[in-house]
Amino acid sequence: PSATLTNIARGGVVDDAALAAALRERRIAAAGLDVFEGEPKVHPDLLTVPNVVLTPHIASATVATRRAMASLAADNLIAALTGATVPNPLNPQVLPLRASRG
């Protein structure tokens, strides 16, 4: 096999037990994960396969990233409170509801 699976998205996107089986049976060459189905716990089967790299999900734990996150949140909040267009909504489907209420 030549496939390598990488999951840095969210736990639950990948079935950890099925992935461990695929790695053990060499249907997948390797995997790299920093999120897990049952976070914060790692599926025990993943701990037994040598062709997986498991790391903590801490990519956003830098001063620069946390400042950017705070700025983004503040920009969204100010826009929402002043009636301006929210620049980065997580649920844009609700914006027309807000507009229709005046």
Q: Can you say where each PLM-predicted feature lies in the sequence?
A:
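Rossmann-like dinucleotide-binding domain for NAD(H)/NADP(H)
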Residues: 5-102
